[in-house]
């Protein structure tokens, strides 16, 4: 009975389906909405990141908005047109593309064209900032926090979007620092007079100037000028002569360094470098005790805080002279000490530091490329008082007194043969030969520098 009933129901269902209209039997498929048009990506490696930044924020009007406008767009185009000097070699081409995109947006009044122009300007700016903040070559970074790093477009655009005035923000970022801006103006003038190509000297000085901050408190040592500058709030508040490395006889030019100083040492020991110990060894071997006593030297067991003092006769000085043995030699604090009364160390792999000196006659010389690489300062007390904000002369006579700073002070040792002065640009002899491309180990990396002249004045 149940089987018969099931058969009957199946037959009825089949009849009903067969009698239904064909269109009713077809299940209607939902009609897909046409895809929303996407804004074209700018021709930039940062194009995808830039578009994603805008999409996440529902396309903010960074460039066409109230904080941007004509002044910011004009500033951007000026920056891009001379960007090869800054290391962005396709800057003029990008400027032409951006200018065309802006023109299309203004004439068409098409929202998609406006968005495309926003992306084009944002990508161009992100590319430029990455170019000027590219990692520097031939710099010893004693403090990794000071190293140039390539910024992500998100950060670049967030700073631009947050700026009260976009035009002023662009000008500030592109300025980099007063040294860089002044040298760049020279490079632009050279390009205008030389078929679009500035001198190698200007381009290499620009590359070396890039590591210098635009603000803050820091020490700047310019080995080409043979002077130390005390910079505070972006202003040069004092300077003094220095003695720097000898590139000719000793072949020890002072390298380019970016580091941070955290303390000074009053009444320092001088630990004699190994190569000098080897050099002195033949003379010491003739009369070890008398030689060391006359120069206030002593031999120590190790570099620990409380090393054992060794007898001069315990060292095989002939073996030291031959290079088959070594020893640790240091000079006690006092009038003969090569470090003078104060030493200003900062981390770096070459062991370079600032220090006082008992040899004052060197500061009267025009050429002060005399040292083994370290930097002898003309007035240690003035430098110390500026660093610490107080007079630290009365520190006593105890040896090796470490005086900590409340806050570390960056130290930038560079080599600029051209710098701004009160009367224009001062130029210095290229004693190290680093104004020739590839003269430094590994070569300094700079832009092509070729620009289309007549593209506008350089923003400072």
Where is each model-derived feature located?
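Cationic-aromatic interfacial patches
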Residues: 25-146
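Bacterial N-terminal signal peptides that target proteins for export
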Residues: 1-9
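Hydrophobic h-region of N-terminal signal peptides that target proteins for export
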Residues: 11-20
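Well-ordered beta-sheet/strand-loop patches within structured domains
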Residues: 20, 25-27, 31-44, 55, ...
């Amino acid at each position: 009975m149940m089987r018969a009933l099931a058969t009957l129901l199946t037959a009825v269902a089949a009849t009903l389906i067969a009698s239904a209209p064909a269109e009713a039997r077809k299940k209607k498929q939902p009609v897909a909405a046409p895809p929303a048009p996407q804004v074209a990506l700018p021709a930039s490696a940062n194009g995808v990141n830039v578009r994603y930044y805008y999409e996440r924020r529902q396309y903010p009007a960074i460039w066409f908005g109230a904080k941007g406008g004509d002044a910011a767009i004009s500033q951007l185009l000026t920056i891009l047109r001379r960007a090869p000097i800054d290391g962005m070699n396709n800057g003029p081409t990008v400027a032409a593309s951006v200018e065309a995109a802006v023109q299309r947006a203004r004439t068409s009044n098409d929202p998609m064209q406006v968005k495309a122009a926003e992306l084009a300007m944002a990508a161009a700016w992100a590319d430029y900032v990455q170019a000027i903040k590219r990692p520097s070559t031939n710099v010893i970074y004693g403090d990794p926090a000071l190293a140039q790093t390539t910024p992500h477009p998100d950060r670049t655009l967030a700073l631009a979007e947050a700026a009260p005035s976009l035009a002023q923000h662009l000008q500030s970022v592109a300025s980099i620092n007063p040294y860089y801006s002044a040298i760049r103006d020279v490079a632009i003038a050279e390009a205008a007079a030389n078929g679009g190509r500035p001198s190698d000297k200007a381009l290499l000085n620009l590359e070396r100037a890039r590591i210098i901050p635009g603000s803050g408190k820091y020490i700047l040592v310019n080995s080409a000028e043979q002077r130390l500058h005390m910079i505070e709030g972006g202003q040069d508040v004092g300077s003094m002569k220095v003695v720097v490395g000898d590139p000719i006889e000793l072949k020890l030019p002072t390298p380019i360094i970016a580091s941070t100083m955290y303390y000074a040492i009053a009444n320092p020991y001088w630990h004699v470098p190994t190569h000098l110990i080897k050099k002195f060894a033949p003379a010491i071997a003739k009369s070890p005790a008398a030689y060391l006593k006359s120069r206030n030297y002593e031999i120590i067991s190790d570099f620990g805080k409380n090393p054992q003092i060794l007898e001069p006769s315990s060292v095989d000085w002939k073996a030291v002279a031959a290079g088959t043995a070594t020893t640790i030699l240091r000079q006690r604090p006092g009038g003969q000490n090569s470090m003078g009364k104060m030493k200003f160390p900062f981390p770096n792999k070459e062991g370079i530091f600032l220090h006082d000196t008992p040899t004052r006659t060197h500061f009267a010389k025009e050429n002060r490329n005399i040292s083994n690489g370290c930097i002898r300062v003309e007035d240690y007390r003035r430098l110390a008082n500026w660093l610490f904000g107080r007079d630290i002369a009365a520190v006593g006579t105890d040896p090796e007194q470490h005086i900590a700073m409340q806050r570390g002070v960056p130290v930038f040792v560079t080599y600029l043969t051209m710098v701004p002065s009160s009367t224009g640009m001062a130029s210095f002899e290229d004693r190290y030969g680093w104004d020739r491309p590839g003269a430094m180990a590994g070569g300094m990396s700079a832009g092509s520098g070729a620009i289309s002249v007549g593209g506008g004045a350089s923003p400072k």
